């Protein structure tokens, strides 16, 4: 209400206990419940990470003459319907919702600005806007933002320009992150960060063989397991939502 933010994504952790089974079994169960997307099981280290995120942070294929990068921010949600007709109506309502479209386009504009830091001049474009993706329990609104990266761009440059993804911060990005730090009780950890794969030179890309290729998700719908001194395993999953001046407590 003070006019400092258009939108902020506020999150909080949910915790529970893993009473039986293994991290691998839990990950398999999560994948059955949320198939597809950009899942990852990070088993190295004392705290396994189980991510069934549907959200692409970026997909980048670099080559000597410059690369191609795609970001697909996810902003806008509606529940799946109980019947085919209701389901179609829910998707149509999401596509037409002024509030959801406004939230989505704010983040699209933010990503366009972030990508411009590493993009060749006049190469940033939005080939898909307000697309609805059907997931098992919800409809999600996504948009595609693409650019050609400048020759010599490194993966470090990509992260410096884009991280963290604007869909989990808000806009303006820096002020939203400052507000998140002030309001949220603890750091988010891997939740809302980035998990991905970097592939070596020689991978096929849109313009031939790549010098590097990288795909990273935004780890929403992600569980972190921590073993306690008593042998019990605590499971933590972050949840959150974008808040605007038009948001209500019921939503």
Which residues make up each language-model segment?
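Extended alpha-helical targeting/anchoring segments
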Residues: 1-251
């Amino acid at each position: 209400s003070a006019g400092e933010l258009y939108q902020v994504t506020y999150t909080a952790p949910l915790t529970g206990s893993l009473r039986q089974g293994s991290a691998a079994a839990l990950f398999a169960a999560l994948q059955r419940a949320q198939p597809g997307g950009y899942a990852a099981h990070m088993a190295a280290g004392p705290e396994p990470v189980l991510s069934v995120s549907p959200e692409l942070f970026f997909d980048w294929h670099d080559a000597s003459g410059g690369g191609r990068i795609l970001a697909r921010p996810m902003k806008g949600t509606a529940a799946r319907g109980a019947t085919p007709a209701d389901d179609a109506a829910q998707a149509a309502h999401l596509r037409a919702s002024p509030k959801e479209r406004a939230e989505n386009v704010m983040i699209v504009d933010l990503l366009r600005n972030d990508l411009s830091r590493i993009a060749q001049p006049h190469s940033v474009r939005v080939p898909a806007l307000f697309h609805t993706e059907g997931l098992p329990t919800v409809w999600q609104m996504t948009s595609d933002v693409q650019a050609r990266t400048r020759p010599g761009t490194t993966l470090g440059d990509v992260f410096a320009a884009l991280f963290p993804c604007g869909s989990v911060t808000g806009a303006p990005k820096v002020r939203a992150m400052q507000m998140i730090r002030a309001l949220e009780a603890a750091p988010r950890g891997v939740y809302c960060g980035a998990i991905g794969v970097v592939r070596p030179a020689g991978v096929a890309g849109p313009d031939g063989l790549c010098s590097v290729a990288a795909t990273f998700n935004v780890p929403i719908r992600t569980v972190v397991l921590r073993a306690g001194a008593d042998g019990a395993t605590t499971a933590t999953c972050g949840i959150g939502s974008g808040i605007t001046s038009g948001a209500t407590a019921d939503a």
